[in-house]
Amino acid sequence: MTKPLGVGILNNRHKATGDVFPEAVESMTTLNREAAVAATQAGITAATDVTGFGLLGHLFKMCRASGVGARIDMSAVPVLDAARTSVSEGFIPGGSRRNLDWVKSNLAEQFQVGAGVSDDEVILLADAQTSGGLLLVGEIPGHPVIGYTTDEPGIQIS
């Protein structure tokens, strides 16, 4: 992941309250060009931008197209701090809920959430992003590795 999640939630809060989040603006105005160049130089051949379907939706689509599954380490996923607070205060866009429902309905029992992962954390993974980061299958310096692919189908979050 090349950018933190949470922009959609903060945009939703902004619409409701007028609160402005400079960290969200910075994320949305940062281009993916440098990350894309680094990914190309690292030999990465599978990537997508995380936008309207959220991380989970885009990850599901990549996995389905490639015939693989994925494991996500929630503690490694970058999230804007204000988004965590906003989710706990109920500022959850309807689109994020629909994204999560769509992934769950497509994966059924192959969508698994570990006991230590909260509902708030899962909804953050489904948050629709504006100018989101890149989800890469591989590793580039300076960006967190949030999980890995596997031959077993489905998505597991721990």
Question: PLM ranges: what are they?
Answer:
Residues 1-158:
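Helix-biased detector of long, well-ordered alpha-helical tracts
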